[in-house]
Amino acid sequence: MLELLQRDAETRALLVFPTKALCQDQFQSFNRLLSAVGLTGYLVGVFDGDTPADLRRRLRDKGSVIFTNPDMIHAAMMTQHGRWSEFLSCLSLVVLDELHVYSGILGSNMALLLRRLFRVCRHYGAAPQIMALSATIANPEELFLKLTARPCVVVDRDGSPRGKRTTVLWNPPRIRQTNWRSRRSANVEAHELMARLIANGVPTITFSKAKMTAEMIYRYVCDKLREIAPQQASKVTPYRGGYRP
């Protein structure tokens, strides 16, 4: 994307994320990247339900890179595509993050939305390249074809430099005092492991399936760190959907 901007200042990119939290996070990261490489003068912003009206107009008319979600493409861009003609006519790249999310009914809706988007782009003389990303999918080529009706080239090898990595599958221990088949709570194991790792200076991220579970693990980790490494307790923070920017 940076190469596209460097080659052509008029190019446009649309980055699509399934959640507002992820969209905001990637927007902040991209801004830091632009600053690091010295690319200035480009209007980059988030276009979602919380975006003020004046910023929406500026992004529509002058935006180079827009971070958004499927709902906003459907409700704002497609229903008023005439107002977006300048952006859509210069659209060179569409990025679909977390591709695996789009399955079932959501996937069907997304497939139809993308077909509408690309049809409107053709109407304005644009043929954007599509880039999709996912770390948890077994059939990326098949899903990409179903969603976009276009063939793709799968890049499934990470060529970036990295240090040694160890993968451990952790099974909570059995509780002998009760039923032999019972095991300790995975959430309890998770917060104890996280606290021990942080106390030993290991940067740690813990994922959970629900927002409430994330908050619960966060509280337990902080409580544990106050016992074993008080200086680290203030360095832990939860991050989930539902927070305001």
What are these regions (language model features)?
Residues 26-27, 55, 76-81, 98-113, ...:
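Conserved ATPase-coupling elements of RecA-like P-loop NTPase cores
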Residues 129-133, 137-214:
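Conserved interdomain linker/interface between the two RecA-like ATPase lobes of SF2 helicase motors
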Residues 2-25, 39-40, 122-126:
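Conserved SF1/SF2 helicase motif Ia
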Residues 49-92:
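Conserved helix/coil segment N-terminal to the catalytic DExD/H
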Residues 96-106, 113-143:
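Conserved helicase ATPase motor motifs in RecA-like P-loop NTPase domains
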Residues 12-26, 194-224:
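Conserved strand-helix element at the start of the C-terminal RecA-like helicase core
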Residues 22-48, 146-152, 225-228:
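Conserved helix-turn-beta segment of the N-terminal RecA-like "Helicase ATP-binding" lobe
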Residues 44-56, 70-71, 158-159, 209-212, ...:
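Conserved helicase motor
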